[in-house]
UniProtKB/Swiss-Prot annotation:
Family annotation (InterPro entries): RsmH, SAM-dep_MeTrfase_MraW_recog, SAM-dependent_MTases_sf
Lineage, opening ranks: Bacteria, Pseudomonadati, Pseudomonadota, Alphaproteobacteria, Magnetococcales
Designated name of the protein: Ribosomal RNA small subunit methyltransferase H
Location of the region described as Disordered in the Swiss-Prot/TrEMBL record: 282-313
Superkingdom, natural source: Bacteria
Provenance organism: Magnetococcus marinus (strain ATCC BAA-1437 / JCM 17883 / MC-1)
Residues that, per the record, bind S-adenosyl-L-methionine: G33, G34, H35, D53, F80, D101, Q108
Amino acid sequence: MSFQHTTVLLQETVAALAPQRGGCYLDGTFGGGGHSRLLLEQCAPTGRVIGLDRDADAIANGQALVAQMAGRLTLVKAPFAQVAEVLQQLEIAALDGAMLDLGVSSHQLDTAERGFSFIRSGPLDMRMDGDSTTPTAAALLNTLDADALADIFFHYGEERHARRIARMVVKVRQQHPFTTTTDLAERIAHMTPGYSRIHPATRVFQGLRIAVNEELQQLEQALSVLIGLLKPGGHLAVISFHSLEDRIVKRLFRDAAKPPEDPVLRGLPIAQAQRPKATLKLVHNKPLTPSEAEIEQNPRARSAKLRVAQKLA
């Protein structure tokens, strides 16, 4: 099986984890395995990597690397929000480092049958795990009322014309349900004549994808769990691709990098050593971004931001 995906910020992310011989690391978004492969090289000969992915294609494609690494790579089909349960099953108590590469993979975008992109016509699916119990994008489009659709387009897609597009969807589906990516994209484009660089359906597709996969809820849950699973000195690296993801990462990192407020202790003559401590230290004040050379080689990397934090003792 071919799983085409160009790894973003590869060297920067793996360097941020500072892999050590014998360490145990989590790649919560295995994808094409680029980050995991380099991690395994740098924590050799005894270090191991646990790779998670919701996408069965990614797990199947990674089996060759599993065989090559002879017990040092374990792949599990699971969303990264379930990391605590996965590690418990593997009898792993803590991690030396963890990383997440958020968003949709090149393989998912380029496979028309997955329904993530309007560049090629495909079913309006957008499920990262292909789970038949999860509602598809088509199911949301064809059943939710205009207010609920507008909320998805606005809050998850940051689409300015969310209400107008939602009303169009409800009107059109009365004649025939939405079934393909190009059907939806063409309807939206027809409402926005003379658009320039960014296709007018881009934000709507982002909003639907995030809603279908509960991406923001999964991210918030996973980050809180991962911070607790890191060993003192361990690093957590997260690559985000749009402002909604980055805001969550930035907020949770900064909150954990401040000592928790305890109103009961405020103003009491307590020694500094006895006061609550911060959980994380920010490794960089600002996120790392791809070089011009990387963007030229892989234009999809343009919006990537890497934030890194270190667990304090």
